[in-house]
Swiss-Prot record:
Catalytic activity annotation: [protein]-peptidylproline (omega=180) = [protein]-peptidylproline (omega=0)
Lineage, uppermost ranks: Eukaryota, Viridiplantae, Streptophyta, Embryophyta, Tracheophyta
Function: PPIases accelerate the folding of proteins during protein synthesis.
Protein name: 70 kDa peptidyl-prolyl isomerase
PANTHER family recorded: PEPTIDYLPROLYL ISOMERASE (PTHR46512:SF9)
E.C. no: 5.2.1.8
Gene expressing this chain: FKBP70
Length: 559
């Protein structure tokens, strides 16, 4: 395979003075025979034959063309076709005249166009003796045969990627994904230092050298590339001694690597802490996923890390296992993972103890020891989503909101504040838009909104999400400006956010409305003590500062 990343410069006659002005491009939908101006310097393009697809080459790509160049009087001065030899150059690098750089980047594969290039974008006042006179306008009949993308993927010149075979679709692997690749790594003299006909690794963990992980993140499935790798992305200043089948890499050696991304398994990190890992073994259908409250049908096999099977449901002669999400029917990690799956998907889910059986032993088909990480293979056979607001009429929305509120209350009493918060959020969403409600329905809706947002604010305070607690209380006060609970809870949130002035405003207003409220009075007392303490600290700080400013220096004392 050709390892050369230096693109041929072509005939001397074709060399330009610089990269040129890249303004302007082909307008959309040019028809055969139509002529358009590109940019504002007089470059014209006439379409002779349409190309394929929509892609056009980019700056840095190696393009391959056939061309015939003529003066305006029709006199031919050069032709690759006459030589039966295609011409290659690197687009946008000043290897050709400016008119070529600007014009060819508007072409599609297989396209044939006639470019009329003014002197300013060709050879100018000097011309190119003896064939091209000074100030000559030139015409080039150009056919774009193909191009090869060359990308500086590290953005520092450390890794250049040349695409040899385009991949499928548009997705690229991410850090958590497991990729399967084939590669051959060589020194610049062609010595093979490492080779594999198939190896799997997690992108963020890397393999062989840093260049492989960086490269695969830019590749599509089935893509084949040639990498030119500087030492900092290879084996660095130290190099590598020979080991097993791997050859030695000298210090500060550059590498050339053939790399093919055969496939990869998508790994999703679930949850704010990203501790639940879902690896897709079989892709699913469509884009729909279950929502909270959906009834799902699954096949599951639960294993310990040593491979011991402790649970198997829905396989062989068994009916598929059915449960309702977000109802604690299964362990939390499995519940969360299923919410991230599509119908027909098969996934391997790795769940740490805090989202599995915790620090207690669990007796299943086999014993799950305390603090065990468990692994589930899950197939989502089907699901029926819980109804959303748009699925319901007005009376059903109010009824559903009331039901979710009661579910939230039960969860709150059990100390399950995060799950309770979600119930209150869903209840509020059912009645968020009430413009079509009757007057009686609007009254019910208003009261439900107040209750759900107040209760949710209580959840957020328990969860230490003080900013959200403040926002929820503000929503309540927009509906009922004299709501004591909303003022009281917002004051609590402001206090935790160290905004004591706003907290004092709210608590004073709450006391004006309900002077005998014990909780409000106690909170006001605590708040005043905090403010007093802060004022004391501030006074001491400023006193010390002013004392330093007014204290005479040693020289002044002597005087």
């Amino acid at each position: 395979m050709d390892d050369d990343f230096d693109i041929p410069a072509g005939d001397d006659m074709m060399m330009g003075d610089g990269m040129g002005d890249f303004g302007g491009a082909e307008g959309p939908g040019m028809k055969v025979g139509e002529e358009n101006e590109i940019g504002k310097q007089g470059l014209k393009k006439k379409l002779l034959k349409e190309g394929e697809g929509w892609d056009t080459p980019e700056v840095g790509d190696e393009v391959e063309v056939h061309y015939t160049g003529t003066l305006l009087d029709g006199k031919k001065f050069d032709s690759s076709r006459d030589r039966d030899d295609t011409f290659k150059f690197k687009l946008g690098q000043g290897q050709v005249i400016k008119g070529w750089d600007q014009g060819i980047k508007t072409m599609k594969k297989g396209e044939n166009a006639l470019f009329t290039i003014p002197p300013e974008l060709a050879y100018g006042e000097s011309g190119s003796p003896p064939t091209i006179p000074a100030n000559a306008t030139l015409q080039f009949d150009v056919e774009l045969l193909s191009w090869t993308s060359v990308r500086d993927i590290a953005k520092d010149g450390g890794i250049f990627k040349k695409i040899l075979k385009e991949g499928d679709k548009w997705e690229n692997p991410k850090d958590p994904d497991e990729v399967f690749v084939k590669y051959e790594a060589r020194l610049e003299d062609g010595t093979v230092v490492s080779k594999s006909e198939g190896v799997e690794f997690t992108v963020k963990d890397g393999h062989l050298c840093p260049a492989l992980a960086k490269a695969v993140k830019t590749m599509k499935k089935g893509e084949k590339v040639l990498l030119a790798v500087k030492p900092q992305y290879g084996f660095g200043e130290m190099g590598r001694p020979a080991a097993g089948e791997g050859g030695a890499v000298p210090p500060n050696a550059s590498l050339v690597i053939d790399l093919e991304l055969v496939s990869w398994k998508t790994v999703t990190e679930i949850g704010d802490d990203k501790k639940i890992l879902k690896k897709v073994l079989k892709e699913x259908e469509g884009y729909e996923r279950p929502n909270e409250g959906a009834v799902v049908t699954v096949k599951i096999t639960g294993k310990l890390q040593d491979g011991t099977v402790f649970l198997k449901k829905g396989h062989d002669e068994q009916e598929p296992f059915e449960f309702k999400t977000d109802e604690e029917a299964v362990i939390e990690g499995l519940d969360r993972a299923v919410l991230n799956m599509k119908k027909g998907e098969v996934a391997l889910v790795t769940i740490p103890p805090e989202y599995a059986y915790g620090s207690t032993e669990s007796k299943q088909d086999a014993i799950v020891p305390p603090n065990s990480t468990v692994i589930y293979e899950v197939e989502l056979v089907s699901f029926v989503k819980d109804k959303e607001s748009w699925d319901l009429n007005n009376s059903e929305k109010i009824e559903a909101a009331g039901t979710k509120k009661e579910e939230g209350n039960a969860l709150f009493k059990s100390g399950k504040y995060a799950r309770a918060s979600k119930r209150y959020e869903k209840a509020a969403k059912f009645i968020e838009y009430d413009t079509s409600f009757s007057e009686d329905e609007k009254k019910q809706s208003k009261q439900l909104k107040i209750t759900c947002n107040l209760n949710n604010a209580a959840c957020k305070l328990k969860l230490k999400d003080y900013k959200q607690a403040e926002k929820l209380c503000t929503k309540v006060l927009e509906l009922d400006s004299r709501n004591v609970k909303a003022l009281y809870r917002r004051a609590q949130a402001y206090t935790q956010l160290a905004d004591l002035e706003l907290a004092e405003v709210d608590i004073k207003k709450a006391l004006e409305i309900d002077p005998e409220n014990r909780d409000v009075k106690l909170t006001y007392k605590t708040l005043k003590e905090k403010i007093k303490e802060i004022n004391k600290k501030d006074a001491k700080f400023y006193s010390n500062m002013f004392s330093k400013m007014t204290k005479p220096s040693a020289e002044e004392s002597k005087a």
